[in-house]
């Protein structure tokens, strides 16, 4: 998505000012910062408002003869709460139309799914951005979308044609394997209500707690059947966090299995599991090696059992 944002800015607003709220100057992993990407694109950052409150007149008062873009950035990896105010995309689109300035929204993680239908926190969808009238929308092909890492750009034909003709487009284009993986993912969105389980990210986010608990009990039973008196197995209530720069406030109730082995530290267990032929990633809490069953597939339970069994035999 950083590439998509850069390409849009370089095409639309190079040498011109881009108006953006101070509360939306995001940084994600790898030190990707909106101001830095904007500077590299040749665009000129024009900050408005404050960290927690930005109003419509902040944008309008900042418009000058050399304003090239109104930019709205979804804070997909953090949330500003409390005494806050922001300007909706619809309001920015109306302002852009009044002064004939294009409006771009960077959704960051991006999603086609209304997660509130599944009892999760609402995230703005790509469809909503398009319906609101944004001239250009950028978002990630991975993260909440569930496909390969890629930057996505959708929008109005005139701007997309300019973007496609930019020589930098060829330098940033994805390879054919990534394109094939992306197409395969997007095809599933044609019937997403039926296909949601076929996209691992979405399946894990929407997995019912009862199903997770059943898996946790099954894994605990498999581990107990190893029959090593040194190992204790505990069922644990957990909270899953999506991560990946998305849904920062969401905590999903989940179930986990905690492992403790006499004479072997939790750090050693974690290292051994991570070094397995198929790496097994857990976390450590209170000297327990813990696995969240939300992210473990049904056919992976035996892999975990065999890895622990082999570790115990060598210890």
Write out the residue ranges for each language-model feature:
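Structural motif of enzymes handling amino- and sulfur-group chemistry
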Residues: 158, 166-167, 174-224, 237-239, ...
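Flexible, glycine/charged-enriched surface loops at secondary-structure junctions
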Residues: 100-101, 141, 171-177, 192-199, ...
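Short, flexible, solvent-exposed loop/turn segments with mixed acidic/basic and small polar residues
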Residues: 7, 35-36, 139-142, 193, ...
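PLP-dependent enzyme catalytic core of the Aspartate aminotransferase-like
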Residues: 259-315
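Short Gly/Ser/Thr- and Asp/Glu-enriched loop/turn motifs at secondary-structure junctions
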Residues: 145-148, 252, 283-289
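Conserved PLP-enzyme active-site core in the AAT-like
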Residues: 1-189, 224, 307
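Short glycine/threonine-rich loop-to-helix capping motif typified by GTGT followed
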Residues: 117-119, 210-211, 245-250, 295-301
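Conserved PLP-binding catalytic core of the aspartate aminotransferase-like
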Residues: 204, 209-213, 217, 226-272
């Amino acid at each position: 998505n950083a590439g998509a944002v850069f390409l849009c800015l370089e095409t639309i607003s190079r040498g011109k000012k881009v108006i953006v709220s101070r509360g939306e100057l995001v940084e994600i992993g790898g030190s990707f910062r909106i101001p830095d990407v904007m500077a590299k694109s040749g665009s000129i950052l024009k900050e408005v408002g404050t960290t927690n409150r930005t109003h419509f007149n902040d944008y309008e008062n900042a418009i000058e003869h050399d304003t090239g873009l109104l930019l709205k950035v979804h804070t997909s990896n953090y949330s500003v709460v409390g005494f806050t105010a922001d300007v909706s995309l619809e309001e920015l689109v109306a302002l852009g139309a009044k002064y004939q300035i294009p409006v771009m929204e960077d959704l960051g993680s991006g999603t086609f799914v209304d997660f509130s239908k599944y009892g999760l926190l609402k995230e703005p969808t790509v469809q909503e951005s398009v319906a609101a009238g944004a001239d250009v929308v950028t978002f990630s092909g991975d993260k909440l979308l569930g496909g390969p890492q890629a930057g996505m750009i959708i929008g109005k034909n005139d701007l997309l044609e300019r973007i496609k003709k930019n020589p930098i487009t060829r330098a940033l284009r994805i390879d054919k394997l990534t394109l094939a993986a992306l197409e395969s993912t997007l095809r599933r969105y044609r019937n997403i209500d039926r296909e949601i389980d076929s996209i691992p990210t979405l399946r894990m986010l929407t997995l019912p707690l009862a199903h997770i608990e059943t898996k946790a009990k099954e894994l605990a039973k498999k581990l107990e059947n190893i029959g090593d008196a040194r190992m204790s197995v505990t069922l644990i209530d957990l909270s899953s966090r999506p991560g990946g720069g998305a849904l920062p406030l969401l905590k999903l109730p989940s179930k986990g299995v905690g492992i403790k082995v006499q004479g072997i530290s939790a750090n050693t267990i974690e290292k051994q599991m991570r070094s397995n032929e198929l790496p097994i990633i857990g976390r450590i809490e209170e000297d327990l090696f813990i696995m969240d069953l939300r992210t473990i597939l049904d056919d992976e339970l035996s892999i975990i059992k065999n890895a622990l069994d082999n570790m115990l035999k060598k210890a």
